[in-house]
């Protein structure tokens, strides 16, 4: 997976994703094997993202490294790998948890997210991300600090 930084972390749509990918210079991206100028479009797959307007299916681009043969999905920084819940909603859930607020507020703002999604996000946060963020002195807010 290769994360593409976007300033607008709340905007997720197929047209926005396509415009970001279209504007990318693939030869400037680096593979995890440390080679650059070696990635080419390999294919696409469908991925569901749960937004407040409803769940949408994105067509996500995959690239392949000509040096090591690895394939990578190109994800926007507003998307969390292996999750249907956008980064901004996950951040809000964790912040509400840390501030002892009602965790269902995010569910009300984004009806696509249910209580099981919230429990799963909090389990991952408590077991893994909370200590990593603290040890690296990365604050939970503002959102830009999480993705830089």
Question: Which residues does each predicted region cover?
Answer:
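Short, conserved DNA-binding cores of transcription-related domains
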Residues: 1-79
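Short, positively charged, Gly/Tyr-enriched micro-motifs
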Residues: 69-148
């Amino acid at each position: 997976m290769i994360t593409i930084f976007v300033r607008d972390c709340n905007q997720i749509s197929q047209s926005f994703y396509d415009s970001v990918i279209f504007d990318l210079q693939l030869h400037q991206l680096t593979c995890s094997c440390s080679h650059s100028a070696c990635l080419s479009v390999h294919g696409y797959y469908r991925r569901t993202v749960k937004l407040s307007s409803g769940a949408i299916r994105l067509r996500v681009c995959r690239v392949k490294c000509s040096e090591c043969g690895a394939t990578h999905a190109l994800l926007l920084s507003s998307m969390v790998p292996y999750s249907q819940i956008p980064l901004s909603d996950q951040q809000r859930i964790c912040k509400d948890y840390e501030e002892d607020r009602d965790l269902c507020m995010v569910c009300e703002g984004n009806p696509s997210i249910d209580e099981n999604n919230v429990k799963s996000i909090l389990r991952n946060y408590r077991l893994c991300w909370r200590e990593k963020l603290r040890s690296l002195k990365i604050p939970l807010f503002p959102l830009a600090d999480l993705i830089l």
